[in-house]
């Protein structure tokens, strides 16, 4: 459709969703690894479901909203598509509304009330492992998605169907309609093969306590953000990945900045990005990284979702984690295929 060809597994995902709906399931998940085109799948919903009513797409970050908007427009050029976020207001006649959860998910939100429940038939959640949060529940309840007789369909997309805080997604979603894992996608040559090196730092994590299924960040930072360990990370990168483009995942902002300094002191072109950084500064760094002016970007939790740079062929886990969700997301930043890429080094 309009130059966006569906891959076989994307066709299968759409067919599986239609089947689930006919079987009476109304809240379902699709699990696809990062980089396998989940946006393309949900952007085909208006066609696949022969949609008569509107579609609402929910995401919690601006990058995800913009990516979704581009795909919806490319695949559905005749539909009116609008974003509802901050100072952008969706026009009432938009057939696809792409909405920011922080904008409409506050209880009593006038902007949520303005979206008439009966006008919508499909609700899509990107990065659905967030869907157990209260802001999402507020939105789901507004649309009556838990009513036993609802005809609306809620579809969540995730690369990792387990949520870190053990709540699980079972209280929101009834079933996983379609799933493919990283191994299958690599075997079918849709993602780059992954190879790994373990570098022993001698750092003991014995004293670091766990909360919500992962290490407590402040305690973890004290142990791993040391000059000696940071320099070891840089040396390992220079030895194992001298010509690769790397993303380095750190514990917190201070660690990301310290890691950046360690790379720079060793002569590696590196910059740090973090959540509170101004949007223009962040975009400038990522543009330099894309162009090759920078070889390494250090960050904490910022590039785990919605960051697409297919040339990344090295992911450095400078932060230990117990979370399968976080680990999968971090690896997923480097698994996209690119002509110049032989494999991903973790």
Language-model segments: which ranges?
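Walker A/P-loop
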Residues: 23-46, 249, 273
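Conserved helicase ATPase core of P-loop NTP-dependent helicases/translocases
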Residues: 82-92, 257-262, 268-304
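Conserved helix/coil segment N-terminal to the catalytic DExD/H
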Residues: 87-122, 133-138
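Conserved interdomain linker/interface between the two RecA-like ATPase lobes of SF2 helicase motors
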Residues: 176-247
């Amino acid at each position: 459709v309009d130059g966006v060809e569906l891959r076989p597994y994307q066709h299968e995902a759409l067919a599986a969703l239609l089947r689930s709906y006919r079987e009476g399931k109304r809240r379902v998940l699709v699990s696809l690894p990062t980089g396998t085109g989940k946006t393309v799948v949900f952007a085909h919903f208006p066609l696949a479901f022969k949609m008569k009513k509107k579609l609402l797409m929910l995401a919690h970050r601006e990058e995800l909203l913009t990516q979704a908007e581009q795909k919806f427009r490319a695949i559905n050029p005749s539909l009116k598509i609008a974003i509802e976020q901050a100072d952008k207001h969706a026009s009432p006649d938009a057939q696809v509304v792409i909405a920011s959860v922080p904008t409409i998910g506050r209880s009593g939100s006038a902007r949520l009330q303005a979206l008439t429940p009966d006008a919508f038939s499909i609700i899509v959640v990107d990065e659905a492992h967030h869907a157990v949060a209260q802001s999402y529940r507020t939105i789901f309840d507004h649309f009556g998605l838990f009513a036993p007789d609802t005809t609306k369909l809620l579809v969540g997309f995730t690369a990792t169907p387990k949520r870190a805080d053990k709540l699980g997604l079972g209280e929101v979603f009834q079933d996983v309609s379609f799933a493919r894992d990283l191994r299958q996608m690599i075997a079918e040559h849709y993602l780059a093969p992954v190879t790994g090196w373990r570098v022993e730092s001698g750092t003991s994590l014995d004293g670091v306590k766990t909360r919500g299924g992962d290490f407590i960040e402040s305690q973890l930072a004290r142990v791993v953000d040391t000059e000696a360990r940071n320099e070891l990370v840089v040396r390992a990168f220079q030895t194992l990945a001298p010509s690769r483009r790397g993303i380095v995942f750190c514990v917190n902002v201070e660690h990301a900045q310290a890691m950046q300094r360690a790379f720079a002191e060793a002569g590696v072109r590196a910059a740090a990005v973090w959540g509170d950084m101004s949007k223009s500064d962040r975009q400038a760094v990522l543009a330099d990284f894309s162009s090759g002016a920078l070889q390494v970007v250090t960050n904490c939790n910022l590039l785990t979702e919605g960051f697409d740079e297919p040339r990344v062929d090295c992911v450095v886990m400078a932060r230990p984690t117990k979370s399968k969700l976080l680990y999968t997301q971090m690896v997923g930043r480097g698994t996209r295929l690119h002509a110049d890429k032989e494999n991903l080094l973790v």
